[in-house]
């Protein structure tokens, strides 16, 4: 709870695979110490259910309001609550051992509904093969939980409960979490907010459990919580809620150990990932995923076709429905919360991509396109879609209907193939809803700024307001190495228009696999984009954190400025590069302008000058006369004095600090 942050580690960054694995192991041994400076985990008690909802509370310093140097008078600033995706990793009262997994928050909720049964023998042939393989004993997660499946004839999805009029613990949890104790804020300055433009979204002033239930029942929001992922803290994806951000992790045939992937998971949740997609394509996918599931406080998504392809040695033509079905069951039993399934890549749409500049850029889309052409048959994900629904509703796995024909360049944006697939995804959504299976729709991609809004409008019209989930979109193709920025611009815009979740893009996009720092950079960019979208929509309470920052900035509360920000570590590091002394943390100026020409310092002096007046006027004794000024005149006089001071020191905007 102190204001200091650890110094930047000057040690050499790990380079070899062995060094990276050792660094990841060291990180995971200290995984319980992931808290932010001057922050603590707080819990809000439920009213309908016996639940405790975690969020992060930032303690702020007091504001100097009057008094003298010897006897200052301070005014307390109330603590600031912010959304927290880090789970128990930032609770100093909970000791985490990644070899055992994190606490199973939802286990009693799931069992209390009495519509699931447990089993110990997997229903997946491949999963059984892995369990029988002694060669992977060394890397296997040891503390495997019991698996759950719906009882015969039961549907265990949150959408099914919502349509029965049931408010589940998950729904109340989400309502409390989305509100962030906003009703307790007393400072009127913090509650200031501009009216937004919501483009038809229906965002209430206060999120209630009933509102959550209704949105899920309508299909306008999803709660991705597999019954086999009891460690997951409930969250919601929908345009009438806070915009969410997804981070991608995953090993490949040439990079990353299990330790590194778990480290990336914990790292991602610390920096604000609302969900994480495991896109692993290398060795030991099954074992890696088990470690991730047992240690994840956020929903985990996958693209099952990637693992199915591994099972046929990378030959797309050899894929079968039976192999894919077994993969779905394997992953559902492990607890995967949502599947990206490219069921909208139809045989007749593939020729539409022939004239594109970049063709089919989606890995899953290209796999299914190749299968369709090789067999000259319709996509088996499409023809077996209802079979997939039957599997998903037994575990409450949500659909993330993949955009396999998304544009891979701005030249291909909004073309015939992209929108043909989108319309098909809308048709499939209706089928999923018939089974009460929760569904979101994936979107592009590469789209120039002026064409983004059309994507949102097209999706809302054809997909029944199911939540939209987009990769960016990237607004230009000219900046490899900076595509977190090119896409962050598009993400902020489409979030404003109604997109419910944004998939981050890292600086390594199109260039290589991201490391830890790339993951953080991508997340920071997308947390900014999501927040900007919430502000633009006028989401209730979205501006509270901005107002707290502005107040701290104007009052030169430097530690509070660091701590209120999304990345306190970087804020402090950048500040200390110029003003490293402790005195720089209490100075009433910053390094930009120095003490003489700090705009906020000048504004404060003008305020103080005016505050010393009587309510209406002040008498000022000059050499040869006494004059009376009104408050407005006094402020004008103060401004004139500052003008003269500015000219006397050379009329330079920036001057060296003394």
Curated annotation (Swiss-Prot):
NCBIfam families tied to this protein: PRK09284.1 (NF006763), PRK13352.1 (NF009895), thiC (TIGR00190)
Start and end residues of each stretch annotated as Disordered: 1-22
Keyword Heme: no
Binding positions for [4Fe-4S] cluster per the UniProt entry: 590, 593, 598
Record-linked PANTHER family: PHOSPHOMETHYLPYRIMIDINE SYNTHASE, CHLOROPLASTIC, THIAMINE BIOSYNTHESIS PROTEIN THIC
Residue ranges of coiled coil: none
Functional pathway: Cofactor biosynthesis; thiamine diphosphate biosynthesis
Entry cofactors: [4Fe-4S] cluster
Protein family membership: Belongs to the ThiC family.
Full protein name: Phosphomethylpyrimidine synthase
Protein residues bound to Zn(2+): 446, 510
Entry keyword set: 4Fe-4S, Iron, Iron-sulfur, Lyase, Metal-binding, S-adenosyl-L-methionine, Thiamine biosynthesis, Zinc
CC per GO annotation: cytosol
Enzyme Commission number(s) of this protein: 4.1.99.17
The protein's assembly and partners: Homodimer.
Binding site for substrate: 248, 277, 306, 342, 362-364, 403-406, 442, 469
One function term, GO molecular function aspect: 4 iron, 4 sulfur cluster binding
Catalytic activity: 5-amino-1-(5-phospho-beta-D-ribosyl)imidazole + S-adenosyl-L-methionine = 4-amino-2-methyl-5-(phosphooxymethyl)pyrimidine + CO + 5'-deoxyadenosine + formate + L-methionine + 3 H(+)
Gene name linked to the record: thiC
